Curated annotation (Swiss-Prot):
It comes from the Eukaryota. Residues 530-673 form the ZU5 domain. Down-regulated in multiple cancers including colorectal, breast, ovary, uterus, stomach, lung, or kidney cancers. The record marks D415, S416 as: Cleavage. The keyword Signal applies. Residues 694-712 are annotated as: Interaction with DCC. This is Netrin receptor UNC5C.
């Protein structure tokens, strides 16, 4: 009763103040209008009154302490919805836009002792019948409405649904028999239910916890993956779905992990079982490496092998008959002999016993004694003199040969045709200053030799790039011979040639080459055009190597919160950085490093590189190689052979590949041609000098991998050499047919120009082009004009693969001292931005991205989830990679961002979402002004 009075007084507090003002103020006004006699008294009275009267502060809007929550009706049990607000004079429920009758409310009211405000709590009961009687597309919902003197407040809507769980699984797991260490996928789609059923897996009735056993993984689609099947994984697996209504179990799927038997190594051959004559030897092996288990196949083949053997029987030796006695000697003895050859001992037989020689006195003890003969002394003296004379003659001959050889060593080589019949005479001393004059035309070499013009005798129809050896090999030094027409470039070693050179010249060659390589290495290390770096935090960003087709996308959230990484991406041009390859393999991309190595990432980054492979992947086996910390190259991914343990994902587009990885390291894409139809794209670029004041004019034809970085390197190199692009580069499909690349020049005005190429064409060997390891590969055509007044050059250049495709360039050049040639925007000077950080690096606004992830990550019964998004965007080559991520949609959108950088293609993305029925996201994109 006291609580009720206090509540009534609290409600009336504002009203009493208002009544006092309305009643007292008019009365005071009447008193002020009374007679003048009491004016002074009235003034005193008014001075004693305050200007304003106290009143209660204004009451605030109701604030909900408890709002109704979603509820589920299990079987026929009704549910209660609760609502509490303060301050509130009234609270009512509204269900499906209709007010609930007052009698259905259970009201509890009290005054908060701290604030003195009224706290009102209301509850209602919802039955199954009420929910079932509702017709319409929307579920049954209820909402609280609270009143106070300041106004009304509405709570959130609470939906009431009838809970259920179907009995039949939409997809049940199926039993499998798998080999040891094979990946196993058990699929399960739980029954339809409200609320959505939770899924867990049982192994022999024990719950599987992937945290405890990391060999198990449960995907976001409720599928169970056994990463590498073990013998202990042989068990019965059951998918369990449960919610507040019921618990359902699928049929049991039996997984049997079998082991195929393997042979042990063969034992050593046994000794021949026959001690004399024919027999056999045998060796054995057992099917225990490993032994077959769980129905695995037994070893195929024989467990015992036998071979014939023959053991030779031993033969004991026997003496031949004694020979006749010899004549009586000077010592009065004679002798006779016999041999152990009748038969001789063989195969371990016993030797003959006894003496081989037998001697006895032949004069019955009577022997003559004679003095030494003086003739023997004369004989010995003659022999000694003859030996001395022979030694003297030998010394004289040796001195003569030594002097003759010494003169030959210091003399000049007058006729080089003695070394190779295909060249005119050349004097080595006169040509020494030109040994290191010109860089190579076709391939890089350790050192170079350039002499005067050579004429070729018996010129054939073509000059291949790999001639027979001109001279004998020179250890550790490759010397190329060039003529001024650029026609011949042998790669043979020349040891006998350098044996005629002085040691100082050979040392000069080596020192020059070492200095050249050192300078090139230093130049590349300090070349900023190959590297991009920047600082990034959890907001992510983009690193771009300008004009190289190489970039690194760091998604938002990839770097842990609160950390800042100094990241980089660089293109390697050193040949030592290229992975080793066999003859059937080719490098399809530049070698690219991203770092810092070992950085902790919470989601994959996207490394983008241009490649030169033909899009038909059926002719290719494409491998992603990674350089380990020790410098060794390892295969990371084989495209099309991914499994659950594959650490990276590769998306191959027509010209670029995108690598999703969480390991910052050095990568390169290598192609292995499975058929001769496999093709790679080449870029053909033709350069000439900016100005030419001599009669000779050189045209360089580069045959490069069709990547932006390869063309960028050549453009920089030619700019330093004073060259210019004569014609727009063209692409050529080069097949793995082992046929060479042939280059020829045609339609020259012979009255004005002549070609210094003596053959009809030049050829580059197939493997020089196919390997992709020959940097700056090119041929040179040298033309000579008859007069300096000739300033126009018109000709055609043909580049084609033998029995393959080709390209024809129509050249129309102006030869002058002023730079001429076409101006192609191959290197965009405005494209110098290397780092973009934060939200500006991404096309999709962050709120829309979060909305897409929240709505598409959860699996949908109709399949309108991240899997359909990947299918619509053609990113569904290996969905298991995305399924292992916490947000598959986010990783797919990261890959889409890298594909469409920098312009983005939001209109296409909006069209895909429209097809998937995501209208609200399309509206959001339109609101952003992007669609």
């Amino acid at each position: 009763m006291r609580k009720g009075l206090r509540a009534t007084a609290a409600r009336c507090g504002l009203g009493l103040g208002y009544l006092l003002q309305m009643l007292v103020l008019p009365a005071l006004a009447l008193l002020s209008a009374s007679g003048t006699g009491s004016a002074a008294q009235d003034d005193d009275f008014f001075h004693e009154l305050p200007e304003t009267f106290p009143s209660d502060p204004p009451e605030p809007l109701p604030h909900f302490l408890i709002e109704p929550e979603e509820a589920y009706i299990v079987k026929n049990k009704p549910v209660n919805l609760y609502c509490k607000a303060s301050p509130a004079t009234q609270i009512y429920f509204k269900c499906n836009s209709e007010w609930v009758h007052q009698k259905d409310h259970i009201v509890d009211e009290r005054v908060d002792e701290t604030s003195g405000l009224i706290v009102r709590e209301v509850s209602i009961e919802i039955s199954r019948q009420q929910v079932e009687e509702l017709f319409g597309p929307e579920d049954y919902w209820c909402q609280c409405v609270a009143w106070s003197s300041a106004g009304t407040t509405k709570s959130r809507k609470a939906y009431v649904r009838i809970a259920y769980l179907r009995k039949t699984f939409e997809q049940e797991p199926l039993g499998k028999e798998v080999s040891l260490e094979q990946e196993v996928l058990l699929q399960c789609r739980p029954p339809e239910g409200i609320p959505v059923a939770e899924v867990e897996w049982l192994k022999n009735e024990d719950i599987i916890d992937p945290v405890e056993d990391r060999n198990f993984y449960i995907t976001i689609d409720h599928n169970l993956i056994i990463k590498q099947a073990r013998l202990s994984d042989t068990a019965n697996y059951t998918c369990v779905a449960k919610n507040i209504v019921a618990k359902r179990k699928s049929t049991t799927a039996t997984v049997i992990v079998y082991v195929n038997g393997g042979w042990s190594t063969w034992t050593e051959w046994s000794v021949c079982n026959s001690r004399c004559g024919r027999g056999y030897q045998k060796r054995t092996r057992t099917c225990t490496n490993p032994a077959p288990l769980n129905g695995g196949a037994f070893c195929e083949g024989q467990s015992v092998q036998k071979i014939a053997c023959t053991t030779l029987c031993p033969v004991d030796g026997r003496w031949t008959p004694w020979s006749k006695w010899s004549t009586c000697g000077t010592e009065c003895t004679h002798w006779r002999r016999r041999e152990c050859t009748a038969p001789a001992p063989k195969n371990g037989g016993k030797d003959c016993d006894g003496l081989v020689l037998q001697s006895k006195n032949c004069t019955d003890g009577l022997c003559m004694q004679t003095a030494p003969d003086s003739d023997d002394v004369a004989l010995y003296v003659g022999i000694v003199i003859a030996v001395i004379v022979c030694l003297a003659i030998s010394v004289v001959v040796a001195l003569f040969v030594y002097r003759k050889n010494h003169r030959d060593f210091e003399s000049d080589i007058i006729d080089s045709s003695a070394l190779n019949g295909g060249f005119q005479p050349v004097n080595i001393k006169a040509a020494r200053q030109d040994l290191l004059a010109v860089p190579p035309d076709l391939t890089s070499a350790a050192a170079m030799y350039r002499g005067p013009v050579y004429a070729l005798h018996d010129v054939s129809d073509k000059i291949p790039m790999t001639n027979s050896p001109i001279l004998d090999p020179l250890p550790n030094l490759k010397i190329k011979v060039y003529n001024t027409s650029g026609a011949v470039t042998p790669q043979d070693d020349l040891s006998e040639f350098t044996s005629k050179l002085s040691p100082q010249m050979t040392q000069s060659l080596l020192e020059n080459e070492a200095l050249s390589l050192k300078n090139q290495s230093l130049a590349r290390q300090t070349d900023p055009s190959c590297t991009a770096f920047g600082s990034f935090n959890s907001l992510g960003g983009h690193l771009i190597v300008p004009n190289s087709g190489v970039s690194l996308l760091i998604p938002a959230g990839a770097i842990p919160q609160g950390r800042v990484y100094e990241m980089y991406v660089t293109v390697h041009r050193k040949e030592t950085m290229r992975p080793p390859m066999d003859d059937s393999q080719t490098l399809l991309t530049p070698v690219v490093s991203c770092g810092p190595p070992g950085a902790l990432l919470t989601r994959p980054v996207v490394l983008t590189m241009h490649h030169c492979a033909d899009p038909n992947t059926e002719d290719w086996k494409i491998l992603l190689k990674n350089q380990a910390a020790q410098g060794q190259w390892e295969d990371v991914v084989v495209v099309g052979e991914e499994n659950f343990t594959t650490p990276c994902y590769i998306q191959l587009d027509a010209e670029a590949c995108h690598i999703l990885t969480e390991n910052l390291s050095t990568y390169a894409l290598v192609g292995h041609s499975t058929t001769k139809a496999a093709a790679k794209r080449l870029k053909l670029a033709i350069f000439g000098p900016l100005c030419c004041s001599s009669l000779e004019y050189s045209i360089r034809v580069y045959c490069l991998d069709d990547t932006q970085d390869a063309l960028k390197e050549i453009l920089h190199l030619e700019r330093q050499m004073g060259g210019q692009l004569l014609e727009e580069p063209k692409a050529l499909h080069f097949k793995g047919s082992t046929h060479n690349l042939r280059l020829s020049i045609h339609d020259i005005a012979h009255s004005l120009w002549k070609s210094k190429l003596l053959a009809k064409y030049q050829e580059i060997p197939f493997y020089h082009v196919w390997s992709g390891s020959q940097r700056n590969l090119h041929c040179t055509f040298t033309l000579e004009r008859f007069s300096l007044n000739t300033v126009e050059l018109v000709c055609k250049l043909c580049v084609r693969q033998v029995e393959g495709e080709g390209q024809i360039f129509q050249l129309n050049c102006t030869v002058s001292e002023e730079p001429t040639g076409i101006d192609l925007p191959l290197l965009d000077p405005a494209n110098t931005i290397t780092t973009v950080t934060g939200p500006s690096a991404f096309s999709i606004p962050l709120p829309i991205r979060q909305k897409l992830c929240s709505s598409l990550d959860a699996p949908q019964t109709r399949g309108h989830d991240w899997r359909m998004l990947a299918h619509k965007l053609n990113l569904d080559r290996y969905l298991n990679y995305f399924a292992t991520k916490s947000s598959p949609t986010g990783v797919i959108l990261d890959l889409w961002e890298a594909q469409n950088f920098p312009d983005g293609n939001l209109s296409m993305l909006a069209a895909v979402l429209e097809e998937m029925g995501r209208h609200e996201t399309v509206v959001s994109l339109a609101a952003e002004g992007q669609y």
